[in-house]
Structures are given as structure tokens and as C-alpha cells.
Amino acid sequence: MSEVKHIQKLFADLYDGVPWTEVKLTTILTDITSEQAAKKIIPEANSIWQLVQHCVGWRDNVLRKLQGDVFHSPKDNYLTQPDNVSPQAWQHLLSHLEQSEKNWERFLEQLDDNKLHAPYLPSKGKFTIYEVIHGILHHDNYHFGQIVMLKKLL
């Protein structure tokens, strides 16, 4: 199996498969309401909503940069608590997450193993494409763990 195929499997498993952590995102978020997602369970911490929004923002950000877009991340790092916390807005965010997963799947389907060790241009050569893609997986896992903990406190 090629390295890109392994990466595709890691993305798919983390989202809705059988990840080694035994925690997949779709299961974590399934029964969380918009009210629960927006709740600041720990006042100094991010809400579940903010964490999902942050993950989606970074997934989109890195993918766009891998595809050649040039832009800057927002100063809030995609962590602003939303004004609209309606069920429709929550569903919209979850749909955006699902679309992000599909966008990564499409990107990875077209990626060749030979390109994995090319420099990730926005990092000015400090990181490879391989490292940045794995970084997104680690980033998601880290924040999904936070979501699991916050969900237990609901």
C-alpha cells in the first residue's frame, strides 16, 4: 500500500472509520445539540463549537495552501464563539466539517507519494507536505480528545 493510501485511511478512520484511538469524530458529535456545543463548560476554555470550528478552519486553511492559495489565517485562529448558535448554524458547521473531509479525500486521491517530501511552501522549507498532512491528523486528534472531555462534563 502506498504512503498516500495509508494517509487516506488515517483521515477516513478518524472521521468515520475505525481509528486506533477508538474515537471517531462522527460518533463524538452525533448527539451534541447546538446548545451543548456552544456552552462554555469551563469559562476559560473553548466550547465544543469553537473546537469544531477551529478544526474545520485549519483543515480548510492547510488544504487551500497545499493547493497554492495564498492567504493569512485570522487572528482569532478560528476560535471566536459564534453569535448564531441555532440548531441550523450547528448543522451548517457539521456539514462544513463533512465537506472538509470530502475535500481532503479528493486532494489525497490525486496526491502522488513522490510529492509527500516536497517542501510545504508556506513554511519556507521548514516542513514537508508529509509533515503538514500528518500535522492536521494530529491536530484533529488532539482537539477531538478535548471535545470528548468537554462532552463528558455536559
Give the ranges of each region predicted by the language model.
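Short, contiguous alpha-helical
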Residues: S2-V4, Q8-E22, T26-L29, S34-T80, ...
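Acidic/histidine-rich alpha-helical segments that form the ligand environment
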Residues: N84-H117, H134-I136
